[in-house]
From Swiss-Prot:
PROSITE patterns: WRKY. Transcription factor. Interacts specifically with the W box (5'-(T)TGAC[CT]-3'), a frequently occurring elicitor-responsive cis-acting element. One of its GO terms (cellular component) is nucleus. Residues 161-225, 300-365 bind DNA. This is Probable WRKY transcription factor 58. It comes from Arabidopsis thaliana. It comes from the Eukaryota. One of its GO terms (molecular function) is DNA-binding transcription factor activity. Its main location: nucleus. GO terms for biological process: regulation of defense response. Keywords: DNA-binding, Nucleus, Repeat, Transcription, Transcription regulation.
Length: 423
């Protein structure tokens, strides 16, 4: 009997299944009602004050009492999020890309819109400091722009025209220039503007633009002009940092004569030191030096005549219209500036023309052999002293040159002319 009761109890327990719990899903409201449910509008037409309102559903509205701007107590987290502390009043929106300047400046807040955690006096002080800083920056920028001393566009610079030769009293016209290796400034070529005046000069400058050398070629056949052409005409005269400078600005006559430039360059070594004007400082002095130029023409089979002095050949060049080149020599005695060039006549191949320039500052060196001694004795110190004492233009003098037995070296003509060079 007891066993049957146990079996029936087990059978009853096995057959009865437990009841499952059920979940009831509430009715889903429309979209407008859902927005009203979340944002608390009630009528479904209010907008969200911000994305932080969604967070309010995650917290329990049991915060301590908080004072709202209208001095009302609230314990709602939503009220805390929508308070002016998180959402200060926004300025009206402006259309367009550029806004007026006064609208971009910060505006002080009204006392009723101050966050409850900041006193109104503090907020006014902050906005006032910002406005003061902006106005100070604007005023400094305006003063810097209007002040000529700070404006880079109004800076004055001392401009020195480096293409003007030093004034020597004559009027010059530039007719060409040539670049120089290792120098930024080219060599300039000038000629006297006086009618039929053959004088030319070359001006060289250093790397800093200062005039270092002026070489004159020829002799002026006129006096210095009295009425100098001023800046009112086409010729300009200006006073610069390196002294008074003058140059003709006649661009129509600016030309490049390659033949003249080549001749001038190759004649540099042929010029005596007295013809070269070197400028070491700002101020220069002008003095006239009388430099004799002796031309000897003789019949000879050799080009270099034995006149008792020792010479060293330093170059030669081709002469136009002459098949024979011109050779250049300089005296080998130290500190002696005498030079000569030797060439044959274009019409007579046996005629040797020797041109001496300068004065020897020493005696005739000792003769190396008898022939040289006889030649030195014939042309010796007495003749050279006589040459140095002669003056005047286009003077001709016959002299005994060399050994009388050697008829091949008897000179036929000696021309001595005086040159006045301003240095």
């Amino acid at each position: 009997m007891a066993v049957e009761d146990d079996v029936s109890l087990i059978r009853t327990t096995t057959l009865v299944a437990p009841t499952r719990p059920t979940i009831t899903v509430p009715h889903r409201p429309p979209a407008i009602e859902t927005a009203a449910y979340f944002f608390g509008g009630g009528d479904g037409l209010s907008l969200s004050p911000g994305p932080l309102s969604f967070v309010s559903s995650l917290f329990v509205d049991n915060f301590p009492d908080v004072l709202t701007p209208d001095n009302q107590r609230t314990t709602s987290f939503t009220h805390l999020l929508t308070s002016p502390m998180f959402f200060p009043p926004q300025s009206s929106a402006h259309t367009g890309f550029i806004q007026p300047r006064q609208q971009s400046q910060p505006q002080p807040q009204r006392p009723d819109t101050f966050p409850h955690h900041m006193p109104p006096s503090t907020s006014v002080a902050v906005h006032g400091r910002q406005s003061l800083d902006v106005s100070q920056v604007d005023q400094r920028a305006r003063n810097h722009y209007n002040n000529p001393g700070n404006n880079n566009n109004n800076r004055s610079y001392n401009v020195v025209n480096v293409d003007k030769p030093a004034d020597d009293g004559y009027n010059w016209r530039k007719y060409g220039q040539k670049p120089i290796k290792g120098c930024e400034y080219p060599r300039s070529y000038y000629k006297c503007t006086h009618v039929n005046c053959p004088v030319k000069k070359k001006v060289e400058r250093s790397s800093d633009g200062q005039i270092t050398q002026i070489i004159y070629k020829g002799q002026h056949d006129h006096e210095r002009p009295q009425n100098r052409r001023g800046g009112g005409g086409r010729d300009s005269t200006e006073v610069g940092g390196a002294g008074q400078m003058m140059e003709s600005s006649d661009d129509s006559g600016y030309r490049k004569d390659h033949d003249d430039d080549d001749d001038d360059d190759e004649d540099d070594e042929d010029l005596p030191a007295s013809k070269i004007r070197r400028i070491d400082g700002v101020s220069t002095t002008h003095r006239t030096v009388t430099e004799p130029k002796i031309i000897v023409q003789t019949k000879s089979e050799v080009d270099l005549l034995d006149d008792g002095y020792r010479w060293r050949k330093y170059g030669q060049k081709v002469v136009k219209g002459n098949p024979h080149p011109r050779s250049y020599y300089k005296c080998t005695t130290p500190n002696c500036t005498v030079r000569k060039h030797v060439e044959r006549a274009s019409t007579d191949a046996k005629a040797v023309i020797t041109t001496y320039e300068g004065k020897h500052n020493h005696d005739v060196p000792a003769a190396r052999n008898g022939t040289a001694a006889a030649t030195a004795a014939a042309v010796g110190p007495s003749d050279h002293h006589r040459m140095r004492s002669m003056s005047g233009n286009n003077m001709q003098q016959h002299m005994s040159f060399g050994n009388n037995n050697n008829t091949g070296q008897s000179p036929v003509l000696l021309r001595l002319k005086e040159e006045k060079i301003t240095i």
